[in-house]
């Protein structure tokens, strides 16, 4: 969908839920189709649909997120493996993560999750579409926790930030080849895994307030790429 000239991006704080007749039946189907195709959709309508969608499905999304989280904490090989290694690095060898600080909530941005050293892990319920996507996101954030404990990551050092982002995208499974083929087709097959990791790392570093721009982020990622891409700890190798 092409940009609308001089369009004003709506402020989500000024939106309210549409009338009930617009949230079900044929009208909801029509709006959903319009959103997917972008045909005849202006920025205001796009923002309104996204607002309505989150309102319509948020309780279901939050419940699903909690259900998926609990399942992964018990049965996911990558999640339980990372949790065990985080416990080994924790003070007094006690588990510092549990259901009280791995939380599901609503996020305003497009991220699937986040980690804060004092608060724990956030899983963005309104951005998670499946159990397996949550597994990737949770594993990604657990790699950040592991790196924080083992390497004392300082996010004010862009090289530190780049390295933990490279490792998290590499080890979480979110850049597995099948995912990339679905997104970008079969072209450059042999480079898809590394390209995905670099792309994600550059985006994350670009969002760091001390990073000037994406060009600086790319330079930093490239400068630490070799050492960080080859560091699969605590895994013996990349298996997801």
UniProtKB/Swiss-Prot annotation:
The active site is at residue 141. GO terms for biological process: mitochondrial protein processing; mitochondrial proton-transporting ATP synthase complex assembly. GO terms for molecular function: metal ion binding; metalloendopeptidase activity. It is found in: Mitochondrion inner membrane. It is a peripheral membrane protein. PROSITE patterns: ZINC_PROTEASE. Keywords: Hydrolase, Membrane, Metal-binding, Metalloprotease, Mitochondrion, Mitochondrion inner membrane, Protease. InterPro entries: Peptidase_M76_ATP23. Its main location: mitochondrion. Its EC number is 3.4.24.-. A divalent metal cation binds at residues 140, 144. Belongs to the peptidase M76 family. This is Mitochondrial inner membrane protease ATP23. The gene is ATP23.
